[in-house]
Regions:
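Cell-envelope/extracellular polymer assembly enzymes that use nucleotide-activated donors
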Residues: 5-7, 38
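Acidic helix N-cap motif at the loop->helix transition within catalytic regions
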Residues: 17-20, 48-56, 102
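Short, acidic, metal-binding catalytic loop of nucleotide-sugar glycosyltransferases
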Residues: 24-35
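A conserved acidic beta->alpha catalytic loop
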Residues: 25, 43-52, 94-100
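Short beta-strand/loop segment that forms part of the nucleotide-sugar
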Residues: 35-45, 67-70
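Glycine-rich, basic loop-to-helix element that forms the pyrophosphate-binding segment
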Residues: 69-85, 106
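Short aromatic/hydrophobic "clamp" motif used to bind/position activated sugar donors
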Residues: 90
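Conserved donor NDP-sugar-binding/catalytic core segment of glycosyltransferases
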Residues: 98, 102-133, 137
Length: 151
């Protein structure tokens, strides 16, 4: 029986405060039997210790790989990850986001159920401090999002 390979791709730059929790959350994803996971993190040449933490994770868990993103632009990092991805499905994730342990399996189920080319789940913006909380509230506003069902 062949394995279904899933590629998680994530861009980052100077995410020391979030990188360990993100990696732990991805590593803890509940995957169906026969699903192999690779995690490609495109680092925008971080100078805050993020690269060291990513290197440690990559050394400890062969599913993880750090990809250099010298342009330091999110889209460039995503493109570099996509070039390296070996999965039949690509799951785009972010280091600032908290994921339920069934996030990937629910995305796979939605793909299989609908035949869609792209799926995602609802999300809720949260912030720390007045400015971030105001931005989070705006993201949740129907006026700002135009009533997008994903929010």
């Amino acid at each position: 029986m062949s394995q279904r390979r899933i590629s998680v791709i994530a861009p980052c730059r100077n995410e020391r405060a979030h990188v360990v929790a993100f990696c732990d959350a991805v590593a803890a994803q509940e995957l169906p039997e026969g699903v192999a996971l690779e995690v490609l993190v495109a680092d925008g040449m971080s100078d805050d210790g993020t690269r060291d933490l990513l290197a440690q994770r990559c050394a400890a868990d062969p599913r993880f790989a750090m990809i250099d993103n010298p342009r330091r632009i999110v889209s460039s990092g995503l493109n570099r990850c996509i070039e390296r991805a070996r999965g039949e499905v690509i799951v785009r994730m972010d280091l600032h986001t908290r994921y339920e342990s069934d996030y990937i399996v629910e995305c796979l189920a939605a793909l299989d159920r609908t035949g869609a080319a792209n799926v995602g789940g609802p999300w809720r913006a949260e912030g720390e401090g007045a400015t971030q909380e105001a931005v989070a509230a705006a993201f949740q506003s129907r006026w700002v999002t135009g009533g997008a069902r994903s929010r």
